[in-house]
Amino acid sequence: MIMATSLLLGACNPATDVNVKETGDKNLIGKSDIRIKDGRMTPEALWAMGRIGGMNVSPDGKKVVYTVAYYSVPENKSNREVFVMNADGSDNKQITKTGFAENEAVWIKGGTKIAFLCNESGSSQLWEMNPDGTDRKILSEFDGPIEGFKFSPDEKKVLFISQIKYGQRTVDMYPDLPKATGI
């Protein structure tokens, strides 16, 4: 309960941008200004708020890594960034600022690295970086997007999830409806 409260309070406070990677992407979806008119919470105001994603506590229990998704209603897409803060909610820092949708961040190597999924290489692959966001390295080169992963206890092996095409998809049958998902 205390950890959840710290995470919530830390996410509400402005993060300090330290060692933030800039992509030069002018269409980067990030934190928006929330505008509440006439004291009413509108759908636009709700979409302007970031959505906290998964969080993971460091092995020593002192730090928390978590993600926040930001949305663009006009573009109909989102982007997720990685943050690190102390377990008490202090020293909240955004460690990524890219258009590559980093997610699933977890501590590895005794808390000296953060593993995460990112589509910087063209499809979602497994990456690692330092807790300050520096020294990003790709760890996987799977032929397709990785949707989830789990390291073995000794961190020598990785189990990952990826969708494999089986049969005909809706988009294969109806190419004029590329966003359709049901039959």
Regions found by a protein language model. Give the residues of each.
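Predominantly five- to eight-bladed beta-propeller fold
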Residues: V18-I29, R80, I161-I183
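Short glycine/acidic-enriched loop and turn motifs that connect beta-strands
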Residues: Y70-P74, E120-S123, K165-Q168
